[in-house]
Amino acid sequence: MSQSSSDGQRQPAIVILDFGSQYSELIARRVRETEVFSVVLGYSTSAEELRAMQPKGIVLSGGPSSVYAEHAPLCDPAIWELGIPVLGVCYGMQLMVQQLGGVVEAASGKAEYGKAPLEVDDPTDLLTNVTGGSTMWMSHGDSVKALPEGFVRLAHTANTPEAAVAHLQRRLYGVQFHPEVVHSTCGMALIRNFVYHICGCEPDWTTSAFIDEAVAVVREQVGEKRVLLALSGGVDSSTLAFLLKKAIGDQLTCMFIDQGFMRKGEPEFLMDFFDRKFNIHVEYINARQRFISKLKGITDPEEKRKIIGTEFIRVFEEESKRLGPFDYLAQGTLYPDVIESAGTNVDPKTGERVAVKIKSHHNVGGLPKDLQFKLVEPLRKLFKDEVRKVGRALGLPEEIVRRHPFPGPGLAIRILGEVTDEKLNCLRDADLIVREEIREAGLYHEIWQAFAVLLPVRSVGVMGDKRTYAWPIVLRCVSSEDGMTADWSRLPYDLMETISNRIVNEVKGVNRVVLDITSKPPGTIEWE
């Protein structure tokens, strides 16, 4: 059965301690795919804190450091005495080996990066159903030179003698590869072995269980008080609206603030969809001129986000006085939102876990300090794919469930530089063409996001024997599972040609279309 804390919140069955790996959150996703709840915590979480959570298992993530470096991040050594199964991944394995008396050194041969066939020495326990020769993803420059007392080898590769190790009696396991990445062909089999057979977890992290628990937590938190929801029409806020409607009924008021940065036709679609089709009343607020005037002369992307976030709350506060009183503001904040805004990195000079801000998230980074609402964020522990499952279970139609993600600040952060009405109209028309053609090609649901970006430069062109000097549009299409990482989508040439021709011929002020082929990382999906 699932465990709950005294405040009704579900306790994690698997805790991932993060040592700065880019894959830490991916480990959490993979564990959740086995229907077992997992969370990511800082590597400095103490053994006593972990004992209080009563997890069934602990995973030590990879990381960019070397365990023998002066300021290497270290876990509480008392963790090894908790009696809880531990799986160390890459850096996590090396840390386990070193702290328990083994030796880790820089690889004497070649460092191992990329795919490598795994040769299984002991096909039982952790490596049950992991076939010999399976491809595993390697990313390490250090290796284990001597195992601690009581440890045995489970598998090796051509360049890594100790690719998987274990102390079977103490249920301590380590793998030098990354089972969580898609390139590791039997990675999920290994994760299931650890979660189910070694830790004894039960598959109780299901969509229906989450809904029941979230409804109970919201009811407990809110009581008889009223909640105001910022509805955008995307899958996150729409799922949140359906969930809150189920939990608190008419205590929920949905408000759609038209800030003027939506895609073409979306405000009208949103009002018709919720108000008429699903009988969820939505208060429509036309604040277009208010927002555009606040952004006059603003070019810095962080400043734009902060201004939009602050203005959103100001409008909410004003409208809540008219419609309220309201005590709570509901937000569709997701787990990746929190992760991306907070950062999960390790300072190489101090070994401390620090926040490295990429860009502030519109939900968690733009709130004013004098916020008059308490926050309700029942989706903040979910990944995007989990939100879609919840939406479907609540009866949200596929046209909403499978909509491409759209940022809270809208087109304002897809226009680089100053935002003007002219640029907004231009980008709306171009963006509509992109979405129309991708739908027509039957590729809309194969792509994570597809949109247009307007650049703050002009280029020379020739149209009708006349010189033009107009804006370029960037075509940005990416494939992803959860938005944490992404690759650029390989669209057919004919489709890209059609999109380019239509934009140049139909959108006034544009004479060039370029393609963004940057993955995340090193880039981000959005340009601002």
From Swiss-Prot:
Transferase keyword on record: no
InterPro entries referenced in this protein's UniProt entry, alphabetically: Class_I_gatase-like, GATASE, GMP_synth_C, GMP_synth_GATase, GMP_synthase, GMPS_ATP_PPase_dom, Rossmann-like_a/b/a_fold
Keywords: ATP-binding, Glutamine amidotransferase, GMP biosynthesis, Ligase, Nucleotide-binding, Purine biosynthesis
EC numbers, comma separated: 6.3.5.2
A GO term from the CC aspect: cytosol
Annotated catalysed reactions: XMP + L-glutamine + ATP + H2O = GMP + L-glutamate + AMP + diphosphate + 2 H(+)
Binding site for ATP: 232-238
Regions that span the bilayer: none
Pathway entry: Purine metabolism; GMP biosynthesis; GMP from XMP (L-Gln route): step 1/1
GO MF, any single term: GMP synthase activity
Annotated function: Catalyzes the synthesis of GMP from XMP.
HAMAP family: GMP_synthase
Subunit structure: Homodimer.
Protein name: GMP synthase [glutamine-hydrolyzing]
